[in-house]
C-alpha cells in the first residue's frame, strides 16, 4: 500500500549503501566505530550516519515531505581495524546541502553533535574529514597565512622563535612586560601569553597589553628586528574579545592570540575576520584539545581539529613537538602539520591521513612546537618542522641560569647554527648534538644552557598511535 508506515526500522536498510559513488561535493568522514557486543558494524555505522544527518529512531510521517535520498548521510564502506577485534573504520558521505556555508560550528554540530552518546556504540572517534572544494570556498580561512606573515615581519629562511612567559599566573603587568622585553632583546621573535592568562585580579588585560607593547617597541629599537607578543584576547564574551583585539590594533602590535577550543569556533571565526580586516596576525592555542583527541578509540583526532582551525582561521596553531613533554607521535604529527601548511595533501594511511585534501589556495597555518623543549632539541625540531614553523621555548628560555635574555641568546644561536648546518648539507638527525656543541664553544650563553639541560628527557610511550598496516 502507498503511504506512511509507522514503526522502528533498521538503520542499515536506509543508511548503509556500499554501492554509493561519492561526489566531489560530499563531505567525507572516517569514523573509528566500536559497537556494543552483538551490534553488526554495518548497523553501527549506519546509525552514526542517520543521527548525524536526516535520521531519528523511528519512521516519522514528515519523512514524506522531503527527499531523504538527497539529504541523508550514507555509510558507503566499513573495514575492520587490524589488531583490534571489535573496531571498524566506517566511511561516511554527507551531502553538502546539510551544512551552513562558512560555519565550522554547524559542520561539527551536524557531524559529531549528538551521535557520540549513542547506546549502540561503546566508543566512537572521528579520525578524519575530507572537506570538498565547494565548501572550503565559503570560508575566509587564516587571516594572513605563512608567506604574508614572513613579509610583515621581514624574517625569512628559518623557523621563528618564541617563549611563553612564566610563571604563567601571578606576575604583575609591569614585571610581565619586563620579562617580555628581556626575551625579545635577547633574540627571540615573539613572546607569548599563556593560554589561561586572560584578565585576572593580579593582572588586568589592559595593563598587560600596555606594558607588553612598551617592551616590544623598546626591543625593536635596540635590535632593529620586528618583534611581537601574542596578546591573549580570549574573553568571556565575543564582544569583550573583539574589544581587546581593537585595543591591540590601536597599540600597533602585530599579533593577538585566541584559545580556539575553549573560546569556541564562532568566536574564533569572528576574531579571524577582524584580524584579516585590520592587519593583525592571529596565534591559536589548542587548550582543551587532549580532552577531545587523546584517547585512541573515542573523541576526535587532532587532525580534524587542525582542519577545522584552518577553515575557521588562525595564522599559528600549537601542534605538538614530537620530542618534548606533550603527546605527539612523529608520523601522525607530520601528517597534520602538512594538512595545516600545504595546499594539497595525498591520502597516506601511514601518517594517519585518510583522504586526499585539496585546500584550493586557502592560506596555510604555521605549526607551533611548544612544551618541554630546550636547546638540545633544536636540531630535531629544525629537521622535523622545517622553516615554516614556530618553536616556543618557555622554560627553555626563562630557565637559563643567567636569566631571560641569555636564555633567548642561547636559543637563537642554537637555531642559527642548525639552519646553517642544514643549508651546508649536514644531517641534523645524525649530527645534531655535535652541531650544538660546536656552536656552544663560541657562545657562553649556549654553553650554559647545554649544561643545565643535558640530562632532561621525556621518554613516555604515546597514547595515540597509528594502526598496524
Swiss-Prot record:
Record CDD domains:
RuBisCO_large_I
Q: Name one Pfam family in it.
A: RuBisCO_large
Q: Give the record's GO biological process terms.
A: photorespiration; reductive pentose-phosphate cycle
So where does substrate get bound? 114, 164, 168, 286, 318, 370
Print the keywords alphabetically.
Calvin cycle, Carbon dioxide fixation, Chloroplast, Disulfide bond, Lyase, Magnesium, Metal-binding, Methylation, Monooxygenase, Oxidoreductase, Photorespiration, Photosynthesis, Plastid
For this UniProt entry, what is the primary localization, expressed as one broad class? plastid
Binding locations of Mg(2+): 192, 194-195
Q: Entry cofactor note text?
A: Binds 1 Mg(2+) ion per subunit.
- State the needed cofactors, names only: Mg(2+)
Entry's EC annotation: 4.1.1.39
Q: What class of enzyme is it?
A: lyase
What SUPFAM superfamilies does UniProt report for this protein, alphabetically? RuBisCo, C-terminal domain, RuBisCO, large subunit, small (N-terminal) domain
Q: Which residues carry this modification: N6-carboxylysine?
A: 192
Task: Kindly provide the PTM information from the record.
Answer: The disulfide bond which can form in the large chain dimeric partners within the hexadecamer appears to be associated with oxidative stress and protein turnover.
GO CC terms, sorted: chloroplast
**Entry-linked InterPro entries:** RuBisCO, RuBisCo_large_chain_AS, RuBisCO_lsu_C, RuBisCO_lsu_C_sf, RuBisCO_lsu_fd_N, RuBisCO_lsu_N_sf, RuBisCO_lsuI
Write down which residues bear the modification named N6,N6,N6-trimethyllysine. 5
The GO terms describing molecular function are: magnesium ion binding; monooxygenase activity; ribulose-bisphosphate carboxylase activity
Q: How does it assemble?
A: Heterohexadecamer of 8 large chains and 8 small chains; disulfide-linked. The disulfide link is formed within the large subunit homodimers.
Q: What does this protein do?
A: RuBisCO catalyzes two reactions: the carboxylation of D-ribulose 1,5-bisphosphate, the primary event in carbon dioxide fixation, as well as the oxidative fragmentation of the pentose substrate in the photorespiration process. Both reactions occur simultaneously and in competition at the same active site.
Other notes on this protein?
A: The basic functional RuBisCO is composed of a large chain homodimer in a 'head-to-tail' conformation. In form I RuBisCO this homodimer is arranged in a barrel-like tetramer with the small subunits forming a tetrameric 'cap' on each end of the 'barrel'.
Q: Which PANTHER family match?
A: RIBULOSE BISPHOSPHATE CARBOXYLASE, RIBULOSE BISPHOSPHATE CARBOXYLASE LARGE CHAIN
**Hey, which family's this protein in?**
Belongs to the RuBisCO large chain family. Type I subfamily.
Name of the protein described by the UniProt record: Ribulose bisphosphate carboxylase large chain
Gene label: rbcL
Amino acid at each position: 500500500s502507498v503511504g506512511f508506515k509507522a514503526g522502528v526500522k533498521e538503520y542499515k536498510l536506509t543508511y548503509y549503501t556500499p554501492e554509493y559513488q561519492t561526489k566531489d561535493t560530499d563531505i567525507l568522514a572516517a569514523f573509528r566505530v566500536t559497537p556494543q557486543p552483538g551490534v553488526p558494524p554495518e548497523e553501527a555505522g549506519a546509525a552514526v550516519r542517520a543521527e548525524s544527518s536526516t535520521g531519528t529512531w523511528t519512521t516519522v510521517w514528515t519523512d514524506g515531505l522531503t527527499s531523504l535520498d538527497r539529504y541523508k548521510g550514507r555509510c558507503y564502506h566499513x573495514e575492520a581495524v587490524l589488531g583490534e577485534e571489535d573496531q571498524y573504520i566506517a566511511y561516511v558521505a554527507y551531502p553538502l546541502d546539510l551544512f551552513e556555508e562558512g560555519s565550522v560550528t554547524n559542520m561539527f554540530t551536524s557531524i559529531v553533535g549528538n551521535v557520540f552518546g549513542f547506546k549502540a556504540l561503546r566508543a566512537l572517534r572521528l579520525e578524519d574529514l575530507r572537506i570538498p572544494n565547494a565548501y572550503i570556498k565559503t570560508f575566509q580561512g587564516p587571516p594572513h597565512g605563512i608567506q604574508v606573515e614572513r613579509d610583515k615581519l621581514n624574517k625569512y629562511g628559518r623557523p621563528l622563535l618564541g617563549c611563553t612567559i612564566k610563571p604563567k599566573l601571578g606576575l604583575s603587568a609591569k614585571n610581565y612586560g619586563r620579562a617580555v622585553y628581556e626575551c625579545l632583546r635577547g633574540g627571540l621573535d615573539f613572546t607569548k601569553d599563556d593560554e589561561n592568562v586572560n584578565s585576572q585580579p593580579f593582572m588586568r588585560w589592559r595593563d598587560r597589553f600596555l606594558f607588553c607593547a612598551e617592551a616590544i617597541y623598546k626591543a625593536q629599537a635596540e635590535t632593529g628586528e620586528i618583534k611581537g607578543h601574542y596578546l591573549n584576547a580570549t574573553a568571556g564574551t565575543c564582544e569583550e574579545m573583539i574589544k581587546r583585539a581593537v585595543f591591540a590594533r590601536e597599540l600597533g602590535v602585530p599579533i593577538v592570540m585566541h584559545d580556539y577550543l575553549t573560546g569556541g569556533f564562532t568566536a574564533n571565526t569572528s576574531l579571524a575576520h577582524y584580524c584579516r580586516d585590520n592587519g593583525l596576525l592571529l596565534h591559536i592555542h589548542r587548550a582543551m584539545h587532549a580532552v577531545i583527541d587523546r584517547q585512541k578509540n573515542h573523541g576526535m583526532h587532532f587532525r580534524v581539529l587542525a582542519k577545522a582551525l584552518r577553515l575557521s582561521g588562525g595564522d599559528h596553531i600549537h601542534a605538538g613537538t614530537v620530542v618534548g613533554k606533550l603527546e605527539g607521535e612523529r608520523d601522525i604529527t607530520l601528517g597534520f602539520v602538512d594538512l595545516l601548511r600545504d595546499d594539497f595533501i595525498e591520502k597516506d594511511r601511514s601518517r594517519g591521513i585518510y583522504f586526499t585534501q585539496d585546500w584550493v589556495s586557502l592560506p596555510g597555518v604555521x605549526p607551533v612546537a611548544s612544551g618541554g623543549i630546550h636547546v638540545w632539541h633544536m636540531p630535531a625540531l629544525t629537521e622535523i618542522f622545517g622553516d615554516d614553523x614556530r618553536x616556543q621555548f618557555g622554560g627553555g628560555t626563562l630557565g637559563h641560569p643567567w636569566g631571560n635574555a641569555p636564555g633567548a641568546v642561547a636559543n637563537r644561536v642554537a637555531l642559527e647554527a642548525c639552519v646553517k648546518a642544514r643549508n651546508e648539507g649536514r644531517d641534523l638527525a645524525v649530527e645534531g648534538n655535535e652541531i650544538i656543541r660546536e656552536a656552544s664553544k663560541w657562545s657562553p650563553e649556549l654553553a650554559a644552557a647545554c649544561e643545565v639541560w643535558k640530562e632532561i628527557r621525556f621518554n613516555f610511550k604515546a597514547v595515540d598511535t597509528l594502526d598496524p598496516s
